[in-house]
A protein has these predicted regions:
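C-terminal accessory segments enriched in acidic
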Residues: 1-3, 27-47, 207-393
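Sec-dependent N-terminal signal peptides
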Residues: 5-16
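Sec-dependent signal peptide cleavage junction
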Residues: 17-31
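Soluble metallo-hydrolase cores and metallopeptidase-like ectodomains found primarily
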Residues: 43-90
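Active-site-proximal beta-strand/loop segments in catalytic clefts of secreted hydrolases
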Residues: 71-73, 85, 95-98, 135-139, ...
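Active-site/substrate-binding loop(s) of hydrolase catalytic cores
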Residues: 89, 104, 117-118, 122-280
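Membrane-embedded segments
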Residues: 104-106, 110
Length: 393
Protein backbone atom coordinates (compact mmCIF):
# COMPACT_ATOMS: atom_id res chain seq x y z
CA UNK A 1 0.00 0.00 0.00
CA UNK A 2 1.26 3.47 -0.81
CA UNK A 3 2.47 5.62 2.04
CA UNK A 4 -0.13 7.90 3.62
CA UNK A 5 0.01 11.57 2.69
CA UNK A 6 -0.76 14.04 5.48
CA UNK A 7 -2.77 17.07 4.40
CA UNK A 8 -1.85 20.27 6.21
CA UNK A 9 -4.73 22.09 7.83
CA UNK A 10 -3.03 25.30 6.70
CA UNK A 11 -3.17 24.21 3.10
CA UNK A 12 0.62 23.98 2.69
CA UNK A 13 0.20 20.60 1.12
CA UNK A 14 -2.79 20.73 -1.23
CA UNK A 15 -5.14 17.82 -1.64
CA UNK A 16 -5.06 16.04 -4.96
CA UNK A 17 -7.71 17.41 -7.31
CA UNK A 18 -8.10 14.55 -9.20
CA UNK A 19 -25.05 -3.66 4.05
CA UNK A 20 -25.89 -3.96 3.03
CA UNK A 21 -28.60 -5.97 1.53
CA UNK A 22 -29.84 -9.39 2.65
CA UNK A 23 -29.74 -10.66 -0.93
CA UNK A 24 -26.96 -12.16 -2.99
CA UNK A 25 -24.68 -9.51 -4.44
CA UNK A 26 -24.66 -11.01 -7.94
CA UNK A 27 -28.22 -9.89 -8.48
CA UNK A 28 -28.74 -6.78 -10.62
CA UNK A 29 -28.87 -3.42 -8.85
CA UNK A 30 -32.50 -2.77 -9.67
CA UNK A 31 -35.70 -3.08 -7.68
CA UNK A 32 -39.37 -3.45 -8.60
CA UNK A 33 -40.77 -0.09 -9.60
CA UNK A 34 -37.33 1.39 -10.20
CA UNK A 35 -36.95 3.21 -13.55
CA UNK A 36 -34.09 1.47 -15.35
CA UNK A 37 -33.76 3.63 -18.46
CA UNK A 38 -34.14 7.12 -17.04
CA UNK A 39 -31.14 9.42 -17.06
CA UNK A 40 -31.26 11.05 -13.64
CA UNK A 41 -29.02 13.93 -12.64
CA UNK A 42 -26.48 13.34 -9.87
CA UNK A 43 -24.43 16.50 -10.41
CA UNK A 44 -25.67 17.93 -7.12
CA UNK A 45 -23.70 15.31 -5.22
CA UNK A 46 -20.02 15.82 -4.40
CA UNK A 47 -17.70 13.97 -6.78
CA UNK A 48 -14.22 12.74 -5.90
CA UNK A 49 -12.36 15.81 -7.11
CA UNK A 50 -14.77 18.11 -5.29
CA UNK A 51 -14.46 16.00 -2.14
CA UNK A 52 -10.73 16.65 -1.93
CA UNK A 53 -11.23 20.38 -2.35
CA UNK A 54 -14.05 20.53 0.20
CA UNK A 55 -12.05 18.62 2.77
CA UNK A 56 -9.12 20.95 2.25
CA UNK A 57 -11.39 23.95 2.77
CA UNK A 58 -12.88 22.44 5.93
CA UNK A 59 -9.44 21.63 7.33
CA UNK A 60 -8.14 25.11 6.59
CA UNK A 61 -11.14 26.98 8.00
CA UNK A 62 -11.10 24.84 11.15
CA UNK A 63 -7.60 26.10 11.98
CA UNK A 64 -6.38 22.67 12.94
CA UNK A 65 -9.52 21.30 14.55
CA UNK A 66 -10.23 19.01 11.58
CA UNK A 67 -7.27 16.97 10.35
CA UNK A 68 -7.40 15.43 6.88
CA UNK A 69 -5.11 12.82 5.39
CA UNK A 70 -5.04 10.26 2.63
CA UNK A 71 -5.60 6.91 4.31
CA UNK A 72 -4.96 4.92 1.14
CA UNK A 73 -5.93 4.50 -2.48
CA UNK A 74 -8.63 2.80 -4.52
CA UNK A 75 -7.77 0.24 -7.15
CA UNK A 76 -7.66 2.97 -9.79
CA UNK A 77 -5.43 5.16 -7.67
CA UNK A 78 -7.99 7.58 -6.26
CA UNK A 79 -7.42 8.92 -2.78
CA UNK A 80 -9.47 7.53 0.09
CA UNK A 81 -9.66 10.39 2.56
CA UNK A 82 -9.72 10.22 6.33
CA UNK A 83 -10.92 13.19 8.38
CA UNK A 84 -10.49 13.35 12.15
CA UNK A 85 -12.01 15.84 14.59
CA UNK A 86 -12.07 15.82 18.39
CA UNK A 87 -9.81 14.52 21.12
CA UNK A 88 -12.18 12.56 23.32
CA UNK A 89 -11.63 9.02 24.55
CA UNK A 90 -14.72 7.65 22.77
CA UNK A 91 -14.18 6.88 19.07
CA UNK A 92 -16.88 7.11 16.41
CA UNK A 93 -15.96 5.86 12.93
CA UNK A 94 -18.22 7.00 10.07
CA UNK A 95 -18.12 5.53 6.57
CA UNK A 96 -20.00 6.49 3.40
CA UNK A 97 -20.31 5.28 -0.19
CA UNK A 98 -18.94 1.81 0.22
CA UNK A 99 -21.47 1.49 -2.61
CA UNK A 100 -20.88 4.26 -5.12
CA UNK A 101 -24.53 4.86 -5.97
CA UNK A 102 -25.39 5.71 -2.35
CA UNK A 103 -24.12 9.29 -1.84
CA UNK A 104 -26.16 11.14 0.79
CA UNK A 105 -23.91 9.99 3.62
CA UNK A 106 -20.94 11.80 2.12
CA UNK A 107 -22.86 15.09 2.05
CA UNK A 108 -23.97 14.61 5.66
CA UNK A 109 -20.42 13.87 6.80
CA UNK A 110 -19.09 17.00 5.10
CA UNK A 111 -21.74 19.13 6.81
CA UNK A 112 -20.93 17.62 10.20
CA UNK A 113 -17.18 18.11 9.75
CA UNK A 114 -17.80 21.72 8.76
CA UNK A 115 -19.77 22.36 11.95
CA UNK A 116 -17.45 20.46 14.28
CA UNK A 117 -14.53 22.54 13.04
CA UNK A 118 -16.13 25.79 14.25
CA UNK A 119 -15.79 27.67 17.53
CA UNK A 120 -19.39 26.90 18.50
CA UNK A 121 -19.66 25.92 22.19
CA UNK A 122 -21.67 22.88 21.15
CA UNK A 123 -18.98 21.80 18.67
CA UNK A 124 -16.28 22.39 21.26
CA UNK A 125 -18.11 20.22 23.80
CA UNK A 126 -18.42 17.38 21.30
CA UNK A 127 -14.73 17.63 20.40
CA UNK A 128 -13.79 17.36 24.07
CA UNK A 129 -15.79 14.17 24.59
CA UNK A 130 -15.38 12.15 21.37
CA UNK A 131 -12.97 11.56 18.52
CA UNK A 132 -14.80 11.31 15.20
CA UNK A 133 -13.05 9.68 12.27
CA UNK A 134 -14.75 9.84 8.88
CA UNK A 135 -14.08 7.95 5.66
CA UNK A 136 -16.32 9.77 3.17
CA UNK A 137 -16.72 8.20 -0.27
CA UNK A 138 -14.51 5.25 0.66
CA UNK A 139 -15.16 3.47 -2.66
CA UNK A 140 -14.35 6.36 -5.03
CA UNK A 141 -14.00 4.25 -8.18
CA UNK A 142 -17.58 3.05 -7.76
CA UNK A 143 -18.70 6.58 -6.95
CA UNK A 144 -17.23 7.96 -10.15
CA UNK A 145 -19.11 5.23 -12.05
CA UNK A 146 -22.26 5.78 -9.94
CA UNK A 147 -22.58 2.07 -9.26
CA UNK A 148 -22.42 -0.41 -6.39
CA UNK A 149 -19.27 -2.36 -7.26
CA UNK A 150 -15.69 -1.13 -7.39
CA UNK A 151 -13.45 -1.23 -10.50
CA UNK A 152 -11.31 -4.34 -10.11
CA UNK A 153 -10.89 -7.50 -12.16
CA UNK A 154 -10.34 -10.99 -10.84
CA UNK A 155 -7.06 -11.10 -12.78
CA UNK A 156 -5.85 -8.11 -10.76
CA UNK A 157 -6.79 -9.89 -7.54
CA UNK A 158 -4.80 -12.96 -8.57
CA UNK A 159 -1.86 -10.72 -9.41
CA UNK A 160 -1.93 -9.42 -5.83
CA UNK A 161 -2.65 -12.86 -4.33
CA UNK A 162 -0.99 -15.54 -6.52
CA UNK A 163 -2.20 -18.29 -4.17
CA UNK A 164 -5.68 -17.75 -5.65
CA UNK A 165 -4.69 -18.61 -9.24
CA UNK A 166 -6.54 -21.93 -9.25
CA UNK A 167 -9.76 -20.90 -7.48
CA UNK A 168 -13.02 -19.54 -8.82
CA UNK A 169 -13.76 -15.82 -8.42
CA UNK A 170 -15.61 -14.80 -5.29
CA UNK A 171 -19.39 -14.94 -5.18
CA UNK A 172 -19.61 -11.13 -4.94
CA UNK A 173 -17.72 -10.53 -8.21
CA UNK A 174 -19.93 -8.63 -10.67
CA UNK A 175 -19.67 -9.50 -14.36
CA UNK A 176 -23.29 -9.01 -15.45
CA UNK A 177 -24.75 -6.46 -17.83
CA UNK A 178 -28.24 -4.96 -17.81
CA UNK A 179 -29.98 -1.78 -18.91
CA UNK A 180 -28.34 0.22 -16.14
CA UNK A 181 -24.93 -1.30 -15.38
CA UNK A 182 -22.19 -2.83 -17.52
CA UNK A 183 -19.97 -4.97 -15.36
CA UNK A 184 -19.30 -7.27 -18.31
CA UNK A 185 -16.80 -4.82 -19.79
CA UNK A 186 -15.74 -3.28 -16.46
CA UNK A 187 -16.03 -5.86 -13.66
CA UNK A 188 -15.96 -5.13 -9.97
CA UNK A 189 -16.67 -6.44 -6.48
CA UNK A 190 -19.20 -5.61 -3.82
CA UNK A 191 -16.64 -4.24 -1.37
CA UNK A 192 -19.17 -4.64 1.43
CA UNK A 193 -18.78 -8.41 1.32
CA UNK A 194 -14.98 -8.33 1.49
CA UNK A 195 -14.52 -7.86 5.25
CA UNK A 196 -13.43 -10.49 7.74
CA UNK A 197 -13.81 -10.36 11.54
CA UNK A 198 -10.27 -11.74 11.73
CA UNK A 199 -8.60 -8.43 10.95
CA UNK A 200 -5.29 -10.22 10.29
CA UNK A 201 -6.78 -12.67 7.80
CA UNK A 202 -4.70 -13.59 4.73
CA UNK A 203 -6.63 -15.04 1.74
CA UNK A 204 -6.59 -18.84 1.62
CA UNK A 205 -7.69 -20.80 -1.49
CA UNK A 206 -10.00 -23.06 0.51
CA UNK A 207 -12.11 -20.03 1.50
CA UNK A 208 -13.16 -19.26 -2.07
CA UNK A 209 -15.60 -18.56 -3.68
CA UNK A 210 -17.46 -18.19 -0.36
CA UNK A 211 -21.03 -17.01 0.17
CA UNK A 212 -22.97 -14.29 1.98
CA UNK A 213 -22.98 -16.06 5.35
CA UNK A 214 -19.21 -16.53 5.33
CA UNK A 215 -16.53 -13.91 5.99
CA UNK A 216 -14.83 -12.02 3.19
CA UNK A 217 -11.14 -11.92 2.35
CA UNK A 218 -9.76 -8.33 2.23
CA UNK A 219 -8.86 -8.73 -1.44
CA UNK A 220 -10.03 -5.25 -2.47
CA UNK A 221 -7.81 -2.21 -1.84
CA UNK A 222 -10.78 -0.31 -0.46
CA UNK A 223 -11.64 -2.82 2.28
CA UNK A 224 -7.95 -3.05 3.17
CA UNK A 225 -7.81 0.71 3.75
CA UNK A 226 -10.84 0.64 6.06
CA UNK A 227 -9.46 -2.36 7.96
CA UNK A 228 -6.12 -0.59 8.45
CA UNK A 229 -7.81 2.57 9.72
CA UNK A 230 -9.85 0.47 12.15
CA UNK A 231 -6.79 -1.41 13.39
CA UNK A 232 -4.85 1.83 13.84
CA UNK A 233 -7.69 3.22 15.95
CA UNK A 234 -7.77 0.03 18.01
CA UNK A 235 -4.05 0.38 18.64
CA UNK A 236 -4.38 4.04 19.63
CA UNK A 237 -7.59 3.99 21.67
CA UNK A 238 -8.03 0.35 22.65
CA UNK A 239 -11.29 0.00 20.72
CA UNK A 240 -13.53 1.70 18.20
CA UNK A 241 -16.64 2.42 20.24
CA UNK A 242 -19.03 3.11 17.36
CA UNK A 243 -19.05 2.23 13.67
CA UNK A 244 -21.69 3.73 11.36
CA UNK A 245 -22.09 2.70 7.72
CA UNK A 246 -24.21 4.98 5.52
CA UNK A 247 -26.12 3.22 2.73
CA UNK A 248 -29.17 3.56 0.46
CA UNK A 249 -31.96 1.16 -0.49
CA UNK A 250 -34.78 1.06 -3.03
CA UNK A 251 -37.09 4.12 -3.06
CA UNK A 252 -40.57 2.81 -2.38
CA UNK A 253 -40.55 0.89 0.90
CA UNK A 254 -43.13 1.88 3.50
CA UNK A 255 -43.13 2.02 7.28
CA UNK A 256 -45.03 -1.01 8.56
CA UNK A 257 -48.60 -0.17 9.54
CA UNK A 258 -48.67 3.00 7.43
CA UNK A 259 -48.64 4.18 3.83
CA UNK A 260 -45.67 6.44 4.57
CA UNK A 261 -42.57 6.05 2.42
CA UNK A 262 -39.49 5.25 4.47
CA UNK A 263 -36.99 8.10 4.81
CA UNK A 264 -34.37 5.64 5.94
CA UNK A 265 -34.14 2.31 7.73
CA UNK A 266 -31.74 1.50 10.55
CA UNK A 267 -30.32 -1.65 12.11
CA UNK A 268 -27.89 -2.91 14.71
CA UNK A 269 -28.10 -6.61 13.82
CA UNK A 270 -25.79 -8.09 11.17
CA UNK A 271 -24.66 -11.45 12.57
CA UNK A 272 -26.15 -13.89 15.09
CA UNK A 273 -25.28 -13.12 18.70
CA UNK A 274 -22.02 -15.01 19.42
CA UNK A 275 -23.39 -16.02 22.82
CA UNK A 276 -26.12 -18.00 21.07
CA UNK A 277 -24.17 -19.73 18.28
CA UNK A 278 -20.92 -21.65 18.10
CA UNK A 279 -20.13 -20.05 14.74
CA UNK A 280 -18.93 -16.77 16.29
CA UNK A 281 -18.20 -17.99 19.83
CA UNK A 282 -14.67 -16.56 19.79
CA UNK A 283 -16.18 -13.05 19.63
CA UNK A 284 -18.64 -13.50 22.50
CA UNK A 285 -16.58 -11.37 24.88
CA UNK A 286 -16.32 -8.39 22.51
CA UNK A 287 -19.71 -8.34 20.77
CA UNK A 288 -22.10 -5.79 22.32
CA UNK A 289 -25.53 -6.07 20.75
CA UNK A 290 -27.21 -4.05 23.47
CA UNK A 291 -24.97 -1.06 22.73
CA UNK A 292 -25.74 -1.34 19.01
CA UNK A 293 -29.42 -1.32 19.89
CA UNK A 294 -29.00 1.71 22.15
CA UNK A 295 -27.27 3.61 19.35
CA UNK A 296 -30.06 2.77 16.92
CA UNK A 297 -32.69 3.97 19.36
CA UNK A 298 -30.72 7.21 19.69
CA UNK A 299 -30.99 7.66 15.92
CA UNK A 300 -34.71 6.88 15.94
CA UNK A 301 -35.41 9.26 18.81
CA UNK A 302 -33.42 12.09 17.19
CA UNK A 303 -35.62 11.91 14.11
CA UNK A 304 -38.84 11.68 16.12
CA UNK A 305 -37.92 14.87 17.95
CA UNK A 306 -37.72 16.65 14.59
CA UNK A 307 -41.12 15.38 13.48
CA UNK A 308 -39.80 12.82 11.00
CA UNK A 309 -41.56 9.58 11.89
CA UNK A 310 -40.72 7.71 8.69
CA UNK A 311 -37.84 5.73 10.14
CA UNK A 312 -38.08 1.95 10.05
CA UNK A 313 -36.16 -1.09 11.19
CA UNK A 314 -34.21 -2.93 8.51
CA UNK A 315 -34.86 -6.70 8.21
CA UNK A 316 -33.43 -8.62 11.15
CA UNK A 317 -32.02 -12.13 11.53
CA UNK A 318 -29.06 -11.43 9.24
CA UNK A 319 -25.82 -13.38 9.04
CA UNK A 320 -23.45 -11.18 7.03
CA UNK A 321 -19.95 -11.40 8.53
CA UNK A 322 -18.38 -10.15 5.29
CA UNK A 323 -19.95 -6.73 5.69
CA UNK A 324 -18.04 -3.95 7.40
CA UNK A 325 -20.82 -3.75 9.99
CA UNK A 326 -20.77 -7.47 10.73
CA UNK A 327 -16.99 -7.55 10.99
CA UNK A 328 -16.67 -4.52 13.25
CA UNK A 329 -19.63 -5.51 15.44
CA UNK A 330 -17.89 -8.80 16.17
CA UNK A 331 -14.78 -6.80 17.07
CA UNK A 332 -16.66 -4.90 19.75
CA UNK A 333 -17.98 -1.76 18.05
CA UNK A 334 -21.53 -0.60 18.52
CA UNK A 335 -22.77 -0.82 14.93
CA UNK A 336 -25.39 1.21 13.10
CA UNK A 337 -26.67 0.87 9.55
CA UNK A 338 -28.44 3.69 7.72
CA UNK A 339 -30.38 2.65 4.58
CA UNK A 340 -31.58 5.87 2.94
CA UNK A 341 -34.40 5.99 0.43
CA UNK A 342 -33.40 5.68 -3.25
CA UNK A 343 -30.11 4.99 -5.02
CA UNK A 344 -28.80 7.19 -7.82
CA UNK A 345 -30.17 4.96 -10.58
CA UNK A 346 -33.68 5.18 -9.12
CA UNK A 347 -33.88 8.74 -7.77
CA UNK A 348 -30.82 10.66 -8.90
CA UNK A 349 -30.59 13.72 -6.67
CA UNK A 350 -34.31 14.00 -6.00
CA UNK A 351 -35.05 14.94 -2.38
CA UNK A 352 -31.30 15.31 -1.79
CA UNK A 353 -31.63 18.15 0.72
CA UNK A 354 -34.33 16.44 2.76
CA UNK A 355 -32.52 13.10 2.87
CA UNK A 356 -29.11 14.57 3.71
CA UNK A 357 -30.64 16.56 6.57
CA UNK A 358 -32.32 13.42 7.91
CA UNK A 359 -29.01 11.54 7.87
CA UNK A 360 -27.33 14.44 9.67
CA UNK A 361 -29.99 14.42 12.39
CA UNK A 362 -29.58 10.70 12.85
CA UNK A 363 -25.81 10.99 13.09
CA UNK A 364 -26.09 13.77 15.63
CA UNK A 365 -28.34 11.50 17.66
CA UNK A 366 -25.37 9.14 17.94
CA UNK A 367 -22.69 11.81 18.35
CA UNK A 368 -24.55 13.76 21.03
CA UNK A 369 -25.65 10.60 22.82
CA UNK A 370 -22.09 9.31 23.08
CA UNK A 371 -20.67 12.75 23.92
CA UNK A 372 -23.05 13.47 26.80
CA UNK A 373 -23.45 9.84 27.88
CA UNK A 374 -27.22 9.70 27.45
CA UNK A 375 -27.02 6.84 24.93
CA UNK A 376 -25.86 4.52 27.71
CA UNK A 377 -29.08 5.17 29.64
CA UNK A 378 -31.34 4.04 26.78
CA UNK A 379 -33.23 0.79 27.32
CA UNK A 380 -31.96 -1.43 24.46
CA UNK A 381 -35.32 -3.22 24.35
CA UNK A 382 -36.83 -0.06 22.84
CA UNK A 383 -35.09 -1.13 19.64
CA UNK A 384 -37.64 -3.94 19.27
CA UNK A 385 -40.44 -1.36 19.06
CA UNK A 386 -39.06 0.44 16.01
CA UNK A 387 -41.54 -0.23 13.16
CA UNK A 388 -40.41 -2.66 10.50
CA UNK A 389 -39.89 -1.91 6.83
CA UNK A 390 -42.92 -3.03 4.82
CA UNK A 391 -41.96 -4.81 1.61
CA UNK A 392 -38.48 -5.92 2.69
CA UNK A 393 -37.77 -9.57 3.40
Amino acid sequence: MKKKKVISTLGVIALSASLVTPVFAQQPETSPGTPDEQVLSVEGFTNHEQLGKKLQQIAKSSQGKVQVEVAGYSNRGREIYKATVGQGDKVILLESEIHGNEPTGTEAILNILQFLGTNSPEAQKIREEVTIVALPKMNPDASELSRRGNDLTWAEVVEDFPQLASVRPTWNYYIYQNQTFDYASQPGFDVNRDFNPNLDYVPQPEDFPGNSSQPGWFITPESQVVRDVYKDLQAEFGKVDVFVDLHHQAPYYEVEGTDDLVTFSISGQFVPDPSTTEKYAEYADTYDYDFSRQLNVAVFDALQEKGNANISLYPQGLDLPGTALGTFALNGSGAVLFEVRGQTQSMGQKKKGELVKAVERGLYGIINGVADGTVYDINPEEYESIPLTKGRQ
